[in-house]
Every structure is written in C-alpha cells, then in structure tokens.
Amino acid sequence: MNLVLLDNPKVVDFDAGTPAAEHLSRVLKIAVGDTFWCGVKNGARGLATVTDISPSGKISFSVAWEKDSPDVKLPPVRLLVGLSRPQTMKKIFAAASEIGCARIDVFRSEKGDPAYAESSLWKVGDETLPGILKKSAEQTCIPAFPEFRLYRSLEHFLEENSDEIQKSACVALDVYAPEKSFGNIALPPQKNVLLAIGSERGWTDAERAGLRGNGFAFAHLGGRVLRVETAVAVALSVALSKIDFWTPHKRLS
C-alpha cells in the first residue's frame, strides 16, 4: 500500500485496529513526524504527517493537500475489451487500472460465452471489481478510479458512444487481420484514445466490420498470440508512451 485512501478530506486520524492504522504501524512502522501519501477517491492527493500516536494505537495526522497535480489525473485513454472469463476479467481490471486508463468498457462478444455475463462480478452491489480498482489506487499512489460498464454487445457500445468515437483516435488490436503495427500508428496528442481488444476467442468478421465502419484502425502487437490481459497491458503501455502521458513519481519529502 503506497497510498492510504480516506473517506473524505476531513479525516485526521485512524482508530487503533483499523486496516489503515494496522498498515501504518505494523508494516510501515511509522513514528511521530513520519509522512505517508493519502488521497480521496477521485479527489485530491496529499502528504500526511503523523502528529500523534496514542498508547492505544490511534494515529493522528495532518495533511498538506496537493493543488491541481497532473500526477493524479487519469490518462485520456479508454479501454474497450471483450467479456472474458471472470478470472481473466479480474486480471484485466488489475492491469488496466494500475497502468492507467479513463474507462474500462466491456462488451459481450459474439465468440464469447454468454454465461460470463451472469457472473457475480456484474451483479449490482458486488464489490470485487471496485475492490480491484481500490487496490490499484493504493498500489499506484493515484486516487483516481476509472469508471466501468458492461454492454450487451459491441454494436450496443458503438451506438451509445458514437459521438465520443468520432472525437477519438480509435485503434482495434487484432493479431489476425491487422493493417500495421501499433508501433507505427500515430496518436494525435490533442485527441482522446480508444483502444479495442477482443475477447479470449478474438473478433468475428461482423465485429471487425462494425469497428471499421466507425473509423477504427486495426493494428497488431507483434506476431505472438497474447492473452487478453497481456494484450491490455501492452496496448495501454504503448498508447501512454505515444501520447507522452507518463510523469515521474513524486518521492515522499
């Protein structure tokens, strides 16, 4: 845990025995005067300084909040990925949220198993995927959470997001029918980016036609047939490098 998430910016202490207090005291072994990163979900990040540790283990702190830091913003890259097995989806969400993207949109693909959409992952109130996003925020020290949604089909996604698609640089990754290497595709810095990756069994011809009809370029990530979660990690990394989004991590001071 590199960042402690707060319920709101007014929090100034952690009661003894809470997960945050346990991590700070047992893992980081903090003392009065030590600092740690904290943040509010989709809000500010700040540097907390420990001001008191009570005999019972309650930790009090003050926070110097960052002002409009670019480090805590999500990149202008949206991920569209075909619905896969629940275990694979967990890996996709972990990779995408750690590397960084603005949204994770999932669609039921023509080659995918319809039963995957009945997984508890997609039930209202299930905390598995939100929990993965929370762990990624704590790991990356970035309190910004990507939004996510499940669409009933690729066609449904394309219809509902036509305006956004027209404003974005859209690339579909496909190992079997690419036009060129993703490395050779330019991404205009002033545009949002939309990356589309098929499900575990890939794209159908109808899905390819739908994407091409909406202005998607097709690209490959090399000759290796990658797992979906690996393709997600590679594609996002290449895209973020192309738009020069990366900035150095700030050290505690």
Regions found by a protein language model. Give the residues of each.
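N-terminal positively charged helical leader segments and presequences
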Residues: 1-68
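RNA substrate-binding interface of SAM-dependent RNA methyltransferases
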Residues: 70-171
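A C-terminal functional module that forms or caps the active site or interfaces directly
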Residues: 190-210
